[in-house]
């Protein structure tokens, strides 16, 4: 794990998308075939490789106040989702758990090469793991496009932050995952996520500054 104070890796990530043979939204055609408009849009958003021009800081309260959208979108709800998913946002907190998802097919990869779920809570946790109030956590996801070798955001590096209960600031694109609305109140507080994550910073008490996790 390496920390730096600066520069995003837009050019590197864009080059990776080209090398993988991904489309403009970074989506493998196989992941879009024979699905609903909602599913196709969700897959396109998950596969984004562009970096937001800026990040709007949100508190946990502000994140939880994002519009409540049902599982099936009406025309007006489509407008809301499309507007919200163009926002780059940042959220500060503590990593409660890190989970390797077996959803690689979403990204045109083998199942075991899927997302890294990084679940944030507002307060420091007694320990890293799945205990405690899981219904109060915000889901953020590091997609395969932003995992090593593009970045150093490996499962081990993120788990280390969780075990140390380091304060982090995770930023990226807003995404509404309608497929997990029924999980609200179980292991998540909202269907809104930061997904994909495009920036991870760690607070340094010694330097009194945020340092980017490379």
Give residue spans per PLM region.
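OB-fold and OB-like single-stranded nucleic-acid-recognition modules
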Residues: 29-214
């Amino acid at each position: 794990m390496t920390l730096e104070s600066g520069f995003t890796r837009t050019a590197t990530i864009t080059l990776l998308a080209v090398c993988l043979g991904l489309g403009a939204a970074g989506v493998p055609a196989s992941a879009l075939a024979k699905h609903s408009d909602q599913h196709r849009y969700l897959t396109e958003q998950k596969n984004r490789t562009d970096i937001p021009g800026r990040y709007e800081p949100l508190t946990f309260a502000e994140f939880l106040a994002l519009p409540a959208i049902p599982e099936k979108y009406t025309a007006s709800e489509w407008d809301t989702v499309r507007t919200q998913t163009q926002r780059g946002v940042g959220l500060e907190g503590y990593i409660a758990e890190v989970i390797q998802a077996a959803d690689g097919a979403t990204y045109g990869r083998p199942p075991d090469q899927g997302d890294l779920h990084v679940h944030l809570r507002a307060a420091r946790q007694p320990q890293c793991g799945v205990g405690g109030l899981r219904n109060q956590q915000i889901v953020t996801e590091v997609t395969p496009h932003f995992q090593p070798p593009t970045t150093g955001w490996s499962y081990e590096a993120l788990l280390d932050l969780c075990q140390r209960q380091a304060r982090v600031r995770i930023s990226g694109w807003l995404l509404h995952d309608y497929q997990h609305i029924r999980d609200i109140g179980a292991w998540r507080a909202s269907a809104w996520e930061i997904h994909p994550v495009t920036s991870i910073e760690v607070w340094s008490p010694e330097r009194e500054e945020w340092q980017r996790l490379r």
